[in-house]
Amino acid sequence: MKTIKYLTLFLVTFLVITGLNAQFSKNPLESYSLVKISINSNEDIIRLQMNDITVEHYRGNLKSGIELVINQAEISRLANTGLSYEIKIKDLDSYYQNRSKASQTEMQKSINILNQDNISGFSYGSMGGYFTYDEMIQKLDSMRIMYPNLISVKQNLGFSNEGREIWAVRISDNPGINESETEAPIYFDALHHAREPQAMACLMYYMYWLLDNYGTDPEATYLVNNRQIYFVPIANPDGYEYNNFTNPEGGGMWRKNRKNNGTCFGVDLNRNYNYGWGVNSGSSNDPCSETYRGLSAGSEPETQAIKTFVQTIHPKISFSMHSVAGRYLNPYGYNDTAVNYDIYSEFSSDFAASNNYYYGTVIEMLSYYSSGTTRDYLHSTGTYSWTPEVGGSDFWPLQSEIIPVANENLYGLKYLSWVGGAYTDYVNYNIAGNGFVNANDTLNLQITLKNKGLSMTSKNVTAEVTSLYSNATPLNSSVNFDSIQARQFKNNSGNFLKFKLSSAAAYMDEMKFVVSVKQEGVETSRDTIRINVGKPIVIFSDNGLNGISKWTRAGTGLLWDTTFIDPFYGSKNFADSRFGNSKNSSNNTFTLSDTINLINTNNPRIEFSAKWAEETNFDYTRIQVSTNFGSTWTSLPGRHTTLISGTPSYTSIKRWVSEQINLNSYIGQKIRIRFNLVTDNGVPGDGFYFNNFKVVNYKDEGTSVVLTNLNVPAEYKLYQNYPNPFNPVTHLEFGIPVMQGESELVSLKVYDLLGKEIAVLVNEKLSPGNYIYEFDGSKIPSGTYIYKLESGNFSAVRKMILLK
């Protein structure tokens, strides 16, 4: 009897173990290696995808080769592609078990970041530093206990294939109440792919930042009070738990859910959504493939749970977090179309500048297709959605990387939470009145703001300007903008910010001012603006409103044009790629058609605003001049250029900045100006945008036109210069009568006897009266010159003689 009982117990135990082994035992499809592949073109990546080799989240590029994590079956198929490859790490299981631990110095860096972000609740989990599924649940419960008024009780969205709950929480000031009518709903999820735990770590880090900083940090407090922020930390609990079973210390390479397909396990949940399902090479119909899309669109319970949830909350904007490429992917993934690029480019250029992740469609960023993704589905429902591929050394970054990578993605998560509702940002400035300021003058500053938010009106908007220039005293340093509607501009016309310059303000001094923008008392923007003391005489200007009529395009790739993407108020941008990212292997130019005359200038400058996103040190834009009508070109340094091979260039990612370039080396010459964009065959960035392009000459008002008296002449007068002949200074006098307007556009220019323009002395509106201009001829040769006065229909000329 006992023998039968023990035998029965043995058989039951054997069957249980056998069942577990069937559930969790590994096979060649689950033995992973790190492989480096030499590729020559983007088409090679598509070739890999067509051979059902998982190319997602590769590291590297066409220049150095790409590294993939693939299983043994994929390695066998790789041999059929004809591409050269090298197995870098044959057994990733062994690699993760034996890799070195973080040093004390590395861990101290993480502690410093936590202190900097004022986060106390975030900690490490037991799976290589990452939370397990159960630990994540415990964290959500402890958050609720610690902050019951800020985070909801966890909500079960549905059950996975194996019956595990898919949990969601809401962070808001009334977490138990749906306030989406007055508070914009924002949505974040992670771990659709079970081997990407850093994505979850980034979300949990942000959750703790919101909770731990509430009540002490104005930004965190505002976002919690004015948003409904939803989090799904683990969208694929079965796959993640499977990795915990096979690799409890981290390093599990299982990607899909655990659907039993008969021959193989798993559906790629990020290929199972309805929109674009099964299109192109962006997924596989092979149940054993890492990108198997399932039997039908939305077939998986995990996918169904997420879909039902987002259809309920109607988020304005979202991130579906992945790893490990260091990119922001916007729709669509299943084809070459970049939809709503105005929004995606504008927002991406703002938040990507914080961590230098490039952004664009999947085919632009990674050279392959992905169909049936969360991102594309969310966009199809009216939610602006990105797939952030967060950085790190691999799918399971070292424990010492967890907090630094979470920190480098914190700004993007905050930014998305802002722009889902109201978000006021500084745009640009103008000097009101005559457009310049000198010593003893009052600077009248007009600034333009924009509510970049997708919904909600910005309320109680204020701007405060602080002078960092000791010779500028504030008279009115703050202004109330009241409210700004979503996606609208507003300026402080009629209520200028005012600063009085003292007599110590010197010609060409650079004045710096800090602009702080707040809405409802919370700072949303802080920028530094720079203004030179002196009068900028405009030699050339173009705000893009009249297209590219003043420019010439040439070269390979896309051709420069104007674009409506992310414009300043009252202008259009010029861009190398007007509706999407730049093209690889481009070398093109955008050349100003006019020749710029710098004869008789004393402080000429190029001024414009710009933003750019270009692969660091490989792709770049240069602004160049030629003094020989385009035979040779010289690249110019500016405030924001960096050196590539010793040459000044714009590269990497930068949001809107004001650029100024000194042309003093070219005084007395005529020059051509152009922009030159060059890309290689790597990652094509959003390219280069610029606007409000000007060439100006700053002149000292001590040698400029001066109103001598208010005895208004009855008609225009142009008097003979005195002395004449002269060396090197003479005085030119003229009179302006009363016309229909209060002021008239007046032009006073100097020519040689061949009619060649030598100098523009006056080109501005002047009130009626008598004027004198002190002309300095020290930079031109002896000879006879003509000076010409024009205003309206009036024109007069006289001669003067320079004898040296």
Q: Regions from the language model: what does each represent?
A:
Residues T473-A505:
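Intrinsically disordered, low-complexity Pro/Gly/Ser/Thr-rich segments with frequent PxxP/GP/PP motifs
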Residues F618, T679-Y698:
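Extracellular carbohydrate recognition
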Residues V762-V797:
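Short, surface-exposed loop/turn motifs with a glycine/proline- and acidic-biased composition
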Residues T424-A439, P536-G547, V696-N721, P737-E742:
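Residue-level detector of functionally pivotal "anchor" positions at catalytic/ligand-binding pockets or at interdomain
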Residues R227, N244-A432, P474:
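Metallocarboxypeptidase
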Residues I539-N588, S635-V657:
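Extracellular glycan-recognition surfaces and repeat-rich motifs
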Residues M1, R487, I623, I673, ...:
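Terminal processing/anchoring signals of secreted or surface-associated proteins
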Residues L598-E607, W612, S704-Y722, F726-V750, ...:
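Glycine-centered coil/turn sites that cap beta-strands in beta-rich domains
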